[in-house]
């Protein structure tokens, strides 16, 4: 049984999954090793695919979610590949690597938002999602999780990159 109920919470859940997969479940070692190792790059892509899988399919009807899921996984890997190559080409140029980090994250989140709207991912949700949506504080919980996850890892990485950028600009 499919319930039709548009909700923006789906996009928040996808963004949570993105930040979990791109930061929390990607160790510092993996983040550095994927720059020079196809195996580590594929490991990161697999982690991302798995986290996104458990974020989208329990909540959005499979037939509506499968194409956006594939596009997200492919585009995420492609954007990461481009970023790795840009960072390699401009190794040591902190301005470029800082901008590539920012653009990487903006593009990933923008793709999630565009695909959410393009494929109307909030229109055909699952029975499980409709049941969870009835919890009195579900929306607040999702928003609090999103804020917490952004403040936990992505912000720490962003601040670290700002300090590296500033210290290199002063030298």
Feature roles, as predicted:
Residues 1-8:
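Short, Lys/Arg-enriched N-terminal segments with co-localized hydrophobic residues
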Residues 23-45, 81-117, 134-171:
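Interhelical loop and helix-boundary elements at the membrane-water interface
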Residues 40-60:
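Generic amphipathic, hydrophobic interface segment in small proteins and small subunits
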Residues 123-135:
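Membrane-interface helix termini and inter-helical loops of multi-pass transporters
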Residues 51-57, 109-125:
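Hydrophobic alpha-helical transmembrane segments in multi-pass integral membrane proteins
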Residues 8-17, 66-74:
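Structural signature of hydrophobic alpha-helical transmembrane segments
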Residues 55-77:
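Transmembrane helix-loop-helix
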């Amino acid at each position: 049984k499919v319930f039709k109920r548009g909700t923006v919470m789906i996009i928040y859940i996808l963004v949570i999954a993105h930040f979990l997969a791109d930061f929390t479940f990607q160790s510092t070692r993996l983040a550095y090793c994927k720059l020079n190792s196809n195996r580590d790059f594929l490991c990161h892509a697999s982690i991302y695919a798995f986290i996104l899988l458990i974020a989208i399919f329990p909540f959005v009807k499979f037939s509506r979610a499968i194409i956006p899921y594939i596009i997200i996984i492919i585009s995420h890997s492609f954007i990461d590949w481009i970023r790795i190559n840009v960072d390699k080409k401009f190794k040591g140029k902190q301005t470029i690597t800082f901008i590539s980090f920012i653009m990487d994250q903006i593009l990933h989140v923008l793709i999630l938002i565009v695909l959410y709207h393009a494929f109307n991912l909030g229109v055909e949700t699952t029975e499980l999602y409709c049941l969870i949506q009835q919890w009195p504080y579900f929306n607040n919980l999702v928003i609090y999780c999103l804020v917490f996850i952004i403040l936990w890892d992505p912000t720490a990485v962003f601040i670290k990159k700002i300090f590296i950028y500033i210290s290199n600009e002063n030298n």
